[in-house]
């Protein structure tokens, strides 16, 4: 069973172990935002149980369960920052956001593959605007799974995810995409899912940069998920006992 499957089964079956997070508490050198702090500032937050109730009957969840069995984790970069642990968390955010945003199954398929392979163009963990473009050159294995429009949409999303929002339309025209609104909607979800996992890099996530209202409801959860599941080299050897205690 892959790491994706192991973690998602725990997540879906409501068996994850979350430590209680308090404002200003320091975990692995990261400060986190508490649910109480966020809601006091006007950002209503979804709890873990809320999220489970929302997605448990969704056909998107069923597709996710089946699709992650087919992932070749060797394609994911070997990195503590942008490797498998990041992709697992970001893909869970994509699932939640897609359900909250009432995304169709067909659009979700594109969105899920986009987040799984969005960082395969990386050669290091530094800021690199070109890693999205470089990733598109490695997507040939997906081409037979989609029609031209859908495959170009995935390439557009992956190339654009590492660029500023003001470049979205320029890249959109490059791929001659017909369903522009759909492509831009998928891109927003990908960028937000990626951003929600930035608690691994920064003291806390700046909510104002999130693009959808649904994403702003997941900030506390993202802090909890990172704290509970972080295959960081600092404690890679004991994460299994921590996760399944």
Regions found by a protein language model. Give the residues of each.
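Outer-membrane beta-barrel translocator/channel fold
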Residues: 60-67, 167
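His-Asp-centered metal-binding catalytic motifs of divalent-metal-dependent phosphohydrolases/nucleases
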Residues: 90, 106-126, 131-135, 155-164, ...
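Inter-helical turn/loop segments and adjacent helix faces that build the functional surface
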Residues: 101, 141-150, 209
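Alpha-helix N-cap/helix-initiation sites
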Residues: 80-87, 104-110, 128-129, 148-151
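Divalent metal-dependent phosphate-bond-processing catalytic cores, especially two-metal-ion Mg2+/Mn2+ enzymes
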Residues: 2-55, 74-104, 163-245
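Alpha-helix C-capping/helix-to-loop hinge sites
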Residues: 78, 97, 120-123, 142, ...
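Acidic catalytic motifs of isoprenoid enzymes
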Residues: 69-75, 145
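An active-site-proximal "capping" alpha-helix that borders the catalytic cofactor pocket
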Residues: 89-97, 130-144
């Amino acid at each position: 069973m892959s790491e994706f499957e192991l973690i998602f089964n725990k997540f879906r079956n409501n068996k994850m172990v979350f430590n209680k997070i308090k404002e200003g508490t320091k975990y692995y050198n990261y400060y986190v935002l508490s649910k109480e702090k966020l809601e006091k500032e006007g950002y209503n937050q979804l709890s873990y149980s809320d999220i489970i109730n929302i997605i448990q009957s969704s056909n998107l969840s069923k597709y996710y369960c089946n699709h992650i069995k087919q992932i070749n984790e060797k394609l994911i970069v070997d990195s503590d920052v942008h490797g498998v642990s990041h992709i697992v968390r970001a893909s869970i955010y994509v699932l939640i956001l897609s359900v909250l945003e009432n995304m169709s199954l067909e659009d979700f398929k594109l969105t899920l593959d986009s987040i799984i392979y969005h960082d395969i163009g990386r050669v290091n963990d530094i800021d690199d605007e070109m890693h999205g473009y470089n990733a598109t050159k490695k997507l040939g294995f997906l081409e037979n799974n989609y029609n031209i429009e859908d495959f170009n949409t995935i390439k557009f999303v992956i190339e654009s995810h590492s660029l500023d929002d003001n470049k979205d339309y320029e890249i959109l025209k490059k791929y001659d995409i017909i369903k522009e609104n759909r492509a831009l909607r998928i891109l927003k979800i990908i960028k937000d899912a990626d951003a929600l996992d930035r608690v691994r890099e920064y003291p806390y996530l700046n909510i104002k940069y999130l693009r959808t209202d649904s994403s702003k409801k997941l900030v506390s959860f993202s802090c909890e998920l990172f704290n509970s599941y972080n295959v960081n080299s600092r404690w890679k050897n004991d994460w299994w006992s921590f996760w399944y205690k």
